[in-house]
């Protein structure tokens, strides 16, 4: 350890006893190194860099420009570290998209931590039971103490998760208020100018500014709960790049945090560095920038490379070993071991002052006083006392009181909260937040009546459409490998938590009151089972789709019975909708299938819903963005998918809501605040006399008197549908609109499923094309498939835009289908009238059996089912026939069906089935024969007569994987002889190279052996990529195949062998694009 290095005490959980080097944090303004800006970054799986050499140079220059700042004296490093640690600087502009991404990643990491410790706790508890009979008292005491330590740490993790959820819920509320204020600004800007309008606009501008400040303050508070990253230097790796005596300097920048270290390559191949590890504090808006420079002399420095890396994937419970491509060619890689701790050093270190020690002791006693193994965790009951100060109640009551009394929007700023007061609300909470026994006693059912509902109209809240960003940022790919976790490190982590201090927050999961129920309605029987709901703020906006008819009120609404809810089961509005949708209700005809349809079809369809449209779009953009400039087909696909995304976000009034057809007026802009009406039910005052029944308040929505209802509707003329609108906004039940967290939908379930399937297939094709980009003939074949998908996306966008998905004829979706009447007639039998766009694989095979099984079994007994499964796998572009058990979950779209037969020139299904039957018969023969008969059969079959069909090629390749050397040699000689036919060799080479891009490991291994038999030197580049697989068996087979391909293969293998193999799946780069993942 060089001089000047400082030590920290053990870092939280897993690093007890490990010295940690302080980060060299300079108070220099952070550079804006994201070319697309934080808002231009979609959710990514990669620790990545931004492509483009010019952007790289600009980032490198920004480091060089700060060279003078780097030479500042470092006498106050610890103080600077503490300043950065607390991060008191609030951002100037909120970044809601980035906050959502970081929140999801943080929540997953915390859940992973909790799951890991729960597993360890179960293991120790079982061990304790086994040891009680024959162990000494001292051993039992130590084990019991260890169990209690883990329990305390788990409670702290659960409390930390609740604080994060609280902040995120408050952030979402402020974001929606900001959106509402923005719409109000637009409404007043387009309305006739007057003095009152100008005054109201001024007030709204102030409100908008305060909402923005609130969001920024919450972002800063959330950032302080992200924990810390411990980064350990593992060294540089590179082929023909690292020579003895070379000196390198690595400079890492993360916001205001800096780390610079120098290293030298020794003669024996080892590396010496002046810094071993450092600590970086996670940021919400910020990426790690890494610059590597080679030091040649006093004034000669050569820039090796500079990358900017994503950090979301670093929120994991286990240490991760990552390999970062530094230069464009990927010949220099930086190996780091990164460990994330959910609690930072200062949180786990007792304060030095006597007063602080006392406060810390009190908080510790408050947090851990119930420390027996039998104390329930948050999974069993809530440990929070409901705090009566609620951000939501303050905003809601103020807003509706203003509307009710003043009938003016000029007082909207009264909705805002002071940013400092908001922070104090979350930071200065009482210490004694945990209760041991009151939670279970306070749990009481809540009964609500829906007699307020009279009108049958169901209005869903609308929102202005926003187009997705046309350009997305690309990140360098980085490989992640979990490091080993020792038992001693776990113990040290848990023991380190005993000195931790606790904070507290209000509980969003329960209330200890019982609002008044409808006096005239009957209560639900207490014996009936409750509704299973998802608790916690993680599901603040549920992504579920429900028919509008389930939310419409009937004429006999007054006869509806009250709904019994549980105040400890999370958001009450969500429970209401869950209960409504789970009860018997009217079912629309477009949701039903005709009699005789496959029962699992609807289940298979539902598996693609629940927000999967957004997931499919995000997954496609994630795979496409780093490479969209590489091929013209990628650019065309990006254009069509973006257009389709815009169409779904800009649905006309008929498929969205009644209010979306209104012009943007002040009245319609006020609908943005409807979520304040029913999004939560805050506690009434204890005496029950101070309840404010303001028009538009939560109580008035479910009130029993016509006076209150008419009073509220007189304030807002559009109030008839506000209940259903508010339910849609707060629960995610209903149709998504742009700018809202509700799920996308076309309004037709079958069309939604079809879009998801094709988006997923395009994502798969993109990954295969990128993998085979260095082998042109393979990439060209895959690009042809992608071009057909681009045309499908055009048709899907047209159908979604013009007809709103309400098509009852396949010809309307594919006009060319009328030219293939036999195929059209068969598809009509397979799909239901309510789902013309898709059919389940089981239903398709059932119809094939009814139509063609007899003729096939007549010539080839028992072969009908394998033939049909093979056909389905070909339509779906699968590597091998589907298993019978997976048929019910597979979905075939009408575009897949039509595209397959069109691309293969098939106009008559029966003729094609006859050809396919002969192929399957040959495959069955080869697979069923024993080794001696197999050799005889292959000797009788002339290689020149061998059909170059994928089923035959796949079977021959799989025969090469048999343990029998004689069979393998015979198949090898057979393929070598058959490859003399140029047509056969071309088809076989294309199939086997495409098989290398599939996810089937057995098929990849077989394809490598087949390419070895064909002596396919054209596949060298793909085999080089496959040699970096994370599966040892695949790497071995690919390496052997490389070495068998002559001098070119041997040279490629020697170059590959220079790279270290301790890091899994090290990615490469394509052109100027970075392709490495964190």
Curated annotation (Swiss-Prot):
- Composition bias of kind Polar residues appears in 488-508
Keyword flag Ribonucleoprotein = no
Kindly list any coiled-coil regions of this protein. 108-137
Q: Where is the composition biased (Basic and acidic residues)?
A: 509-525
List this protein's GO terms for biological process.
auditory receptor cell stereocilium organization; cell adhesion; cellular response to chemokine; cellular response to mechanical stimulus; chemotaxis; establishment of protein localization; muscle organ development; negative regulation of cell adhesion
Report the main location listed first in the record: cytoplasm
Copy out the induction comment.
Up-regulated during regenerating muscle tissue.
The protein's job, in short, is:
Acts as an inhibitor of the small GTPase RHOA and plays several roles in the regulation of myoblast and hair cell differentiation, lymphocyte T proliferation and neutrophil polarization. Plays a role in fetal mononuclear myoblast differentiation by promoting filopodia and myotube formation. Maintains naive T lymphocytes in a quiescent state and prevents chemokine-induced T lymphocyte responses, such as cell adhesion, polarization and migration. Involved also in the regulation of neutrophil polarization, chemotaxis and adhesion.
Q: What is this protein called?
A: Rho family-interacting cell polarization regulator 2
Q: Which organism is it from?
A: Mus musculus
Q: What are the top taxonomic ranks of the organism?
A: Eukaryota, Metazoa, Chordata, Craniata, Vertebrata
Q: Which gene encodes it?
A: Ripor2
């Amino acid at each position: 350890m060089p001089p000047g290095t400082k030590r920290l005490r053990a870092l939280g959980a897993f690093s007890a006893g490990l010295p940690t080097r302080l980060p060299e944090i300079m108070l220099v303004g952070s550079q804006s190194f994201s070319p697309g800006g934080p808002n231009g970054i979609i959710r990514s799986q990669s620790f990545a860099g931004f492509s483009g050499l010019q952007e790289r140079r600009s980032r490198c220059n920004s480091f060089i420009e700060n060279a003078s700042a780097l030479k500042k004296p470092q006498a106050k490093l610890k103080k600077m570290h503490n300043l950065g640690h607390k991060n008191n600087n609030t951002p100037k502009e909120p970044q809601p998209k980035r906050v959502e991404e970081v929140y999801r990643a943080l929540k997953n990491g915390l859940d992973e931590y909790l799951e890991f410790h729960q597993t360890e706790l179960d293991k120790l508890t079982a061990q304790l039971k086994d040891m009680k009979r024959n162990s000494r008292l001292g051993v039992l005491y130590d084990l019991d103490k260890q169990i209690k330590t883990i329990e305390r740490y788990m409670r702290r993790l659960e409390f930390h998760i609740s604080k994060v959820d609280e902040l995120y819920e408050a952030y979402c509320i402020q974001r929606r208020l900001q959106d509402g204020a923005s719409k109000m600004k637009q409404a007043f800007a387009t309305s006739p100018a007057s003095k009152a309008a100008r005054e109201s606009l001024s007030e709204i501008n102030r409100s908008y500014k305060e909402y923005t400040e609130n969001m920024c303050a919450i972002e800063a508070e959330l950032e302080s709960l992200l924990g810390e990253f411990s980064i350990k230097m593992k060294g540089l790796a590179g082929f023909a790049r690292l020579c003895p005596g070379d000196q390198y300097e690595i400079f890492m920048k993360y916001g205001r945090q800096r780390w610079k270290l120098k290293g030298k390559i020794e003669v024996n191949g080892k590396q010496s560095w002046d810094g071993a590890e450092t600590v970086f504090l996670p940021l919400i808006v910020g990426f790690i920038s890494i610059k590597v420079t080679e030091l040649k002399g006093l004034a000669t420095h050569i820039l090796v490379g500079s990358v900017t890396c994503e950090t979301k994937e670093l929120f994991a419970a286990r240490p991760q070993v990552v390999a970062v491509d530094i230069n464009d060619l990927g010949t220099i890689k930086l190996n780091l071991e990164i460990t994330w701790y959910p609690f930072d050093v200062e949180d786990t270190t007792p304060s030095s002052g006597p007063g602080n020690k006392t406060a810390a002791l009190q908080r510790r006693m408050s947090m851990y006083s119930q420390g027996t193994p039998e104390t329930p965790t948050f999974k069993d009951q809530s440990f929070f006392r409901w705090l009566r100060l609620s951000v939501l109640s303050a905003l809601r009551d103020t807003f509706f009181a203003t509307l009710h009394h003043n009938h003016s929007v000029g007082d909207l700023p009264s909705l805002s909260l002071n940013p400092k007061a908001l922070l104090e609300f979350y930071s200065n909470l009482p210490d004694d937040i945990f209760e041991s026994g009151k939670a279970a006693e306070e749990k009481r059912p809540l009964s609500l009546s829906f007699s307020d509902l009279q009108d049958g109209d169901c209005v869903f809240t609308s929102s202005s459409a926003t187009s997705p960003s046309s350009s997305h940022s690309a990140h360098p790919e980085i490989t992640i490998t979990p490091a080993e976790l020792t038992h001693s490190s776990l113990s040290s982590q848990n023991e380190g938590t005993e000195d931790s201090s606790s904070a507290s927050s209000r509980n969003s999961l329960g209330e200890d009151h019982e609002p008044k129920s409808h006096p005239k309605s009957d209560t639900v029987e207490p014996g009936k089972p409750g509704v299973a709901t998802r608790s916690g703020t993680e599901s603040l906006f549920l992504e579920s789709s429900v028919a509008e008819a389930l939310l419409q009120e009937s004429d006999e609404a007054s006869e509806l019975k009250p709904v019994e809810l549980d105040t400890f089961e999370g958001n009450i509005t969500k429970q209401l909708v869950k209960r409504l949708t789970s009860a018997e209700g009217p079912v629309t005809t477009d949701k039903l299938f005709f009699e005789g349809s496959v029962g699992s079809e609807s289940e298979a369809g539902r598996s693609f819903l629940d927000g999967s449209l957004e997931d499919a779009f995000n997954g496609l953009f994630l795979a496409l963005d780093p490479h969209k400039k590489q091929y013209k087909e990628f650019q065309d696909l990006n254009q069509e998918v973006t257009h389709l995304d815009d169409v779904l976000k800009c649905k006309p009034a008929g498929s969205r809501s009644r209010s979306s057809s209104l012009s943007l007026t002040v009245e319609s802009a006020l609908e943005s605040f409807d979520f304040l009406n029913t999004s939560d039910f805050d506690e009434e005052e204890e005496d029950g006399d101070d309840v404010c029944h303001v028009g538009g308040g939560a109580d008035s929505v479910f009130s029993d008197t016509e006076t209150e209802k008419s009073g509220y509707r007189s304030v807002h003329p559009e109030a008839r549908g506000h209940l259903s609108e508010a339910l849609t906004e707060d629960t995610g039940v209903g149709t998504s609109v742009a700018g809202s967290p509700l799920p996308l939908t076309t309004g037709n379930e079958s069309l939604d499923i079809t879009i998801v399937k094709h988006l997923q297939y395009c994502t798969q094709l993109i990954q295969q094309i990128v993998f085979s980009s260095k082998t042109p003939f393979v990439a060209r074949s895959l690009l042809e498939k992608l071009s057909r998908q681009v045309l499908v996306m055009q048709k899907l966008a047209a159908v979604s835009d013009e007809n709103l998905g309400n098509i009852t004829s396949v010809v309307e979706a594919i006009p060319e289908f009328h030219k293939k009447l036999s195929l059209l007639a068969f598809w009509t039998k397979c799909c239901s009238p309510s789902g013309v766009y898709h059919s389940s694989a089981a239903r398709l095979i059932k119809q094939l059996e009814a139509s063609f099984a007899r003729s096939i079994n007549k010539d080839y007994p028992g072969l009908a089912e394998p033939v049909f499964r093979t056909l389905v796998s070909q339509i779906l572009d699968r590597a091998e026939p589907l298993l019978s058990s997976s048929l019910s979950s597979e979905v075939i779209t009408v575009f897949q069906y039509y595209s397959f037969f069109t691309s293969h020139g098939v106009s008559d299904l029966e003729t094609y089935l006859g050809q396919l039957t002969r192929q399957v018969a040959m495959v069955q023969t080869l697979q069923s024969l024993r080794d001696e008969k197999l050799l005889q059969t292959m000797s009788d079959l002339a290689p020149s007569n061998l059909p170059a069909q994928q089923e035959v090629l796949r079977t021959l390749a799989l025969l090469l994987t048999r343990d029998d050397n004689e069979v393998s040699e015979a198949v090898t000689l057979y393929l070598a002889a058959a490859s003399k036919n140029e047509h056969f060799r071309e088809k076989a080479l294309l199939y086997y190279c495409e098989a290398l891009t599939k996810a089937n490991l057995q098929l990849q291994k077989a394809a490598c052996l087949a390419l070895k038999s064909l002596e396919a030197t054209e596949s060298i580049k793909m085999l080089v990529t496959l040699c970096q697989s994370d599966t040892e068996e695949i790497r071995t087979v690919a390496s052997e195949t490389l070495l068998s391909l002559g001098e070119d293969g041997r040279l490629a293998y020697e170059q590959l062998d220079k790279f270290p193999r301790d890091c899994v799946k090290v990615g490469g780069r394509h052109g100027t694009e970075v392709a490495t993942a964190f």
